[in-house]
Amino acid sequence: MHIYVDADACPVIGIVERIAKSHNIAVTLLCDTNHYLTSDYSEVVYVGAGADAVDFKLISLCEKGDLVVTQDYGVAAMALSKGAYAIHQSGKWYTNENIDFMLILLYHIFRQNNFYFEVSVYETS
């Protein structure tokens, strides 16, 4: 088992490290280059700045049985699809039974607030 932390603005890094250290579990903190993290225990991986660069790097690293700490429902869904465990920084577990509801709820909140994602149109010439 390995613990991967979506470390951009994650307030529980110290707690994760303390628990992981007591169980001798490796931890990797992933953040973009706009943040600076140091750790005596965890490996820190910097990913180039980009909309979802950290998220995709984290998902490329995690494997079945690993633990992902994230507040991003999309990252949690992708981790679950790989057979990893996913937990919110507040302690709520993401599961295959609740992730669909959480994603749909988020979608409705965005729509209710008139938030729409921009769609790129590529010209073919």
What are these language model-derived features?
Residues 2-125:
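Nuclease catalytic cores that cleave nucleic-acid phosphodiester bonds
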